[in-house]
Every structure is written in C-alpha cells, then in structure tokens.
Amino acid sequence: MDNIRNIVFDFDGTLMDTAPLILGTMKATIEKLGLEPHTDEEYRATIGLRLEEIPAALWQATPEVGKLYAATYRRIFNELKQSFQIECFPGVIDTLKLLNADGYRMAIASSRNRKSLQEYVDSFDISDCFTMLVGGDDVFQGKPAPDPVLKILGSCGWKATETITVGDASVDILMGRAAGTATCAVTYGNGTMEELLSSEPTFMTDTFNALRPIVRGVNPEIVKYVEHSIIPRYDDFDKAHRRDHVRMVIDQSLCLLRRLPELNIDMAYCIATFHDLGLVDGREKHHIASGKILESDSFIRTYFTEQQIDIMKEAVEDHRASGKTKPRSLYGMVVADADRFIEAETIIRRTI
C-alpha cells in the first residue's frame, strides 16, 4: 500500500452517520406513495443506490415510479433534515485532516446529489480536505458502475493504481474494483458483513482511525489486531492515558516517520500502540512493564524476528518523555518524541 496517493470516499455510512435520517425519510416517502413497507435491513441495503433506482430494487417498479419516489423523497428529506442530528463517525474528522497533512489527495463519490453533499461537507468544515466531490447527479451511471470513481480519476489526473476506494456498502467496493482501484470496506456503516465479504474488498476495517495506518502501509492484520486487542486495554487507565492518548501517539509517530523512511513502519506502529500498556501495573515502572508485555505478546512474535522484538522492547522502555537517558534507537526517539509532542496538551490532566 506504499504506492497509494489518492483516496476516494463514499459519504453516507462511511464518513457520516446519516442512516437515521435516510431511513426516516424513506419510510415517510413509502407511506406517502402507498408502497409496500419493507424491513430496515432491506432499506439499508439500498443506501448507496441513486434514489431513482431504489423502487426498482425494492418493488421492481418502473422508471416513472422511480422518478416520483426521488422527487417525493427529496421534498420530505428537506422537511425532516432539521429534526435529525447528523454526526461524523468517530475519528473521521481528525483522520481526514491527518491524511490531508500526510499529502494524500482525497475525493468523495456519493449517490446523494452534489448540492446536498456539498452542504454537509461544508457544515463539518472538511471541504479543504477534498479535491473533488461527485454526486449521483454528476454521472450517467451510479454505483456499482465505476463512473463516479472514473470521473474523479479523469478530472483530477489520478492513476487508478495509486488510488483506494473506501466505503461501507458492496456497491462502493464494486465501484472501486470496476474502476481498477484498491478498495477498503468499513464495517460500521450500512452494509452487512456478508455483503461486504461477497464484494471482495482489498482491505476491511472496523474503525475509521485504522484507515491511516493501512494506507500508510502498515500490515492490515497488525492493524486489525491492535484495534481489537490492544487499544481497548487503554479504557482501563486514567483519563490522560486512554484511547485518545494512544491514538495521538500513533498519529504523531506516523507523522515523524515521513522523515525517516528507512524505519520499519510495522515496528514503529506497534511500539506506539504498546508504549503505555504497562500502566496496568502502576505508573512508576510502566515503561519497563510495557516492554515486557510487547515482548511476550504471542501475536507480535508471529510477525517479527527476535532482533526486531528486542529493538521494539527497548524503544517502548525508552519512550518516557521524562527519562534522563537518550533512547537507544531511532524507534525509541520516534515514540519518545511522539509522546512528548502531546505532553503539553495533557500535562494538566496528568497532574490531577
């Protein structure tokens, strides 16, 4: 994944949690038109299609019904949207800004019309992160056809081989694959696991935060293990050392690695994720305990050599910003500097 320079995102269910508003609007539209009701799961399965295509998917309806449905939906949507609080999924805004700072070029390919898409992007102050927005009304064929991604690639001059498409539904993954890009399915949105697996994405992730390590080239299996088995352990620590802290250390470590391309990114990532786990035994010697936890981790031992594990253990032990001795390796310097970088933001919390 070290060749990835461009990222194309889906919007609904990937960046923003719009499902309550969409489902509410769908149900009101269906009732208004006297159509046969379906289950929420069946409604969710149509998110990602253009509005005009939904009646055909749910009721095998004619194109004329599709046009009527779309017009009714848009009118009801505008009436209801002020009643729903739309939020970004956890980690979206921070990760987008970090990816932007990393130099990745980003765009959105959505089935919603571009005016609505632009309004939401502007409302969350993330428009500067994107080179281009493509709505369902900008292309002749919508998802799962490749047209939205191809329009972005052509307009921006991006290569498909340097691009990854990220989405929560099978139509997003199929769109990206048809356009020749790598793909990443996020599992927290509207698509079911069965649907996502059947679309054969290049990668899958349960959290948006994990996307940055993946596109930076960290082994996706390591990212998955860390997200499921390591980061949740920070929930038991004091307020200054919970998930937000370890994620900041990870993010800052990845930033520092831009200037140190000779370092192994998998090693640096794991060092950052393990650096404070020793707090489970108290703060005084937590850096030593953290090193032992990393060294004895069975998953880590399947991915790294003994020499690499020794270096990683030393780096974890050397991470303390208040330590009097110089880190023994560049890896130790990276995690120490990453931890020290955020110290100013957390020093007050750490002394309470």
Regions flagged by a language model, labelled:
Residues 264-352:
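Divalent metal-dependent catalytic cores for phosphoryl transfer on phosphate-bearing substrates
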Residues 218-285:
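Acidic/His-rich, divalent-metal-binding segments that scaffold phosphate/diphosphate chemistry
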Residues 1-45, 59:
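Active-site neighborhood of HAD-like aspartate-dependent phosphohydrolases
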Residues 3, 79-108, 114-118, 146:
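Short, acidic loop-to-helix structural element flanking the phosphoryl-transfer center
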Residues 47-80, 90-93, 97-98:
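A metal-dependent, Asp-based hydrolase signature
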Residues 38-42, 65, 128-132, 160-164, ...:
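Short acidic capping loops at alpha-helix termini that bridge into adjacent secondary structure
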Residues 29-30, 50-64, 120, 152-153, ...:
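Helix-loop "lid/cap" segments that line or gate small-molecule binding pockets
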Residues 1-7, 97, 114, 118-220:
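Asp-based, Mg2+/Mn2+-dependent phosphohydrolase catalytic module
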